[in-house]
Amino acid sequence: MLYPSVDKLQKTVPSKYTIVTVAAKRARQIQDGKRVKVANPKSYKPVGKALEELFSGEVVVTNQPQD
């Protein structure tokens, strides 16, 4: 079972595609050695940890135009 669920995540980030993109980028950072911002994450995989960070508000989505 995925924690947090996609439905819960969509309350903070409305687009499923944005959730996937942000979680993937953050998971790569975690995998490359960046510190996890959530204390005692339930997941042991980088993607799960990234989703938990997104749900808790530790990772914030900002819209920045691409050049």
Curated annotation (Swiss-Prot):
Domain of life: Bacteria
Biological processes, Gene Ontology terms: DNA-templated transcription
Keywords, in A-Z order: DNA-directed RNA polymerase, Nucleotidyltransferase, Transcription, Transferase
Reaction(s) the record says it catalyses: RNA(n) + a ribonucleoside 5'-triphosphate = RNA(n+1) + diphosphate
Record GO cellular component, one term: DNA-directed RNA polymerase complex
InterPro entries for the chain: DNA-dir_RNA_pol_omega, Pol_omega/Rpo6/RPB6, RPB6/omega-like_sf
Alphabetical list of Pfam families matching this protein: RNA_pol_Rpb6 (PF01192)
EC number: 2.7.7.6
Alphabetized GO MF terms: DNA binding; DNA-directed RNA polymerase activity
EC category name: transferase
SMART domains found in the cross-reference section: RNA_pol_Rpb6 (SM01409)
NCBIfam families: rpoZ (TIGR00690)
Subunit comment: The RNAP catalytic core consists of 2 alpha, 1 beta, 1 beta' and 1 omega subunit. When a sigma factor is associated with the core the holoenzyme is formed, which can initiate transcription.
Family: Belongs to the RNA polymerase subunit omega family.
Role: Promotes RNA polymerase assembly. Latches the N- and C-terminal regions of the beta' subunit thereby facilitating its interaction with the beta and alpha subunits.
Name by which UniProt lists this protein: DNA-directed RNA polymerase subunit omega
Source species: Exiguobacterium sibiricum (strain DSM 17290 / CCUG 55495 / CIP 109462 / JCM 13490 / 255-15)
